[in-house]
Amino acid sequence: METLSQRITSMESVQLQGIAVAFVTASALYYVLPAAISHIQLSALPMLGKTEVVVIPPKLLSELSKSPRTLSAEIAGNEFIAGKYTKVKALTPILLHSITKYLIPSLGRNAVVMSEEVSNAVRLGIPTCNDWTGVNIYPKIMRMVTVSTGRFLVGSELNRSEDYIDTVHNYALDVSSAQSAVHKMHPWIRPLLAEWLPEIRRLRKRTEEAFALFESLIKERMKMQRELSESELPDDLLQWMIANRHNYNNEDAHDLVYSQLGLTFTANHSTASTITNALYTLATMGDLIDVIRDDITQALAESGGQFTSKALDSMWKFDSFIKETVRMNPLVMSVAVRKVVEPIKLPSGQVIPTGVTLETPLVAVNLDDQIFPNADVFDPMRFYNLREKDRKQGDAREAEFNQLISSSTSHMSWGFGKHTCPGRAFAAQQIKMILAHIILRYDIKLVGDSTDRYENIPKGHLSLPDPTKDILMKRREI
């Protein structure tokens, strides 16, 4: 299998007033050498569709986080998604509150419900495969994710509806197209012409369809909120948002729909891509499948066959494999993206002016041999071995840093600091459940005689699994 370092694209750098300035395309940044970051203080990168971007090494993140008023993740995110024109609201205050206060604490009591939803989605989504059968897996995974996520976002009234599945899926596609179209326009022209772009108008139409789809459900849920006791209410994100909307000035049903759509846009595709990346890797490593399957089976045996949160947490080898997959196949090129709203003076004396965007190249962290020895080699048991070592030494805190949902300057796939993905525990549980149900039911391998993992596709700031590829699947006798 080709290592990540072998896919690095060269870039031309020059020194300007003591700061390394690199002229690269957006996709080339994904392949920045770790050495290029670890040996310089800052790199200034002119990026397509953006003002100047300053790439900062991870060692500066903790220092910068001490002055939160000088940086804005919200402004940076809104610029990235062209929110002024797409109207995407990725993480509104009411959504953040509902996720952290209600969704994450509900994972334990709803784990079996999620497992049942996933089991049904896998059963309906994948062919019988009594013999080795080619399966275009990404679209099927995307549907499984949409349905199982939807159960906890909008409830059982909508999550399996074809109208809901189609709306959520196509909304994400339309947002991506609209975002790309806006960024291709010169910033000075956008206020005049962006609203007339075909991609923006198509997105508006899609959003109106979503409003129509959600309207009757939201009205019914508001009625339930007025008339039913708390124990009788649906246990999902929509109801929690309705219950708290007065505290966040979200009394308009449209605000609730925008929040729901923004969440599905950011969550569903990243979850589906992570699962697909894991399956593409597993298809090249037949011996590993048995190891992972045994880990899952042992944990389920200790939980009475139920996919409880405790059972999922005890699958250390499975967890390690997924975390290593995420490390070697990051979906985004950069993390900790912030807009400078007040000038920042660094310990070195350098000053970063207002208006600059800061970000840290994720691959530079993931391929740093000082953090991960033999960093460009895929080691599925890397984090399992580290956790076992920490456990034997009685260092429970350090062991936590080596599990899938951990976040630090060494583990940045979920983001960093107070803007670390608030729903990562939900996403991790869902990723494990979908993969586990597939691994327990099917053997998988690549099509033909190839042993090389399918290449991911660079797309702007993203690196995505190829959605057109098939894997061979065969039903196991259980």
Curated annotation (Swiss-Prot):
It is found in: Membrane. The keyword Oxidoreductase applies. Its main location: membrane. InterPro entries: Cyt_P450, Cyt_P450_CS, Cyt_P450_E_grp-IV, Cyt_P450_sf. Pathway: Mycotoxin biosynthesis. Its EC number is 1.-.-.-. Pfam families: p450 (PF00067). CDD domains: CYP503A1-like. The keyword Signal does not apply. GO terms for molecular function: heme binding; iron ion binding; monooxygenase activity; oxidoreductase activity, acting on paired donors, with incorporation or reduction of molecular oxygen. The chain crosses the membrane at residues 20-42. Keywords: Glycoprotein, Heme, Iron, Membrane, Metal-binding, Monooxygenase, Oxidoreductase, Transmembrane, Transmembrane helix. GO terms for cellular component: membrane. It is a single-pass membrane protein. One of its GO terms (biological process) is secondary metabolic process. Glycans are attached at residues 159, 268. PANTHER family: CYTOCHROME P450 (PTHR46206), P450, PUTATIVE (EUROFUNG)-RELATED (PTHR46206:SF7). Cytochrome P450 monooxygenase; part of the core atranone cluster (CAC) which products are predicted to catalyze most or all steps of mycotoxin atranone synthesis, starting from geranylgeranyl pyrophosphate (GGPP). The initial cyclization of GGPP to dolabellane is probably performed by the terpene cyclase ATR13. The Baeyer-Villiger oxidation near the end of the atranone synthesis, which converts atranones D and E to atranones F and G is predicted to be catalyzed by the monooxygenase ATR8. Of the CAC's other predicted gene products, the reducing PKS ATR6 might synthesize a polyketide chain. Belongs to the cytochrome P450 family. This is Cytochrome P450 monooxygenase ATR3. It comes from Stachybotrys chlorohalonatus (strain IBT 40285).
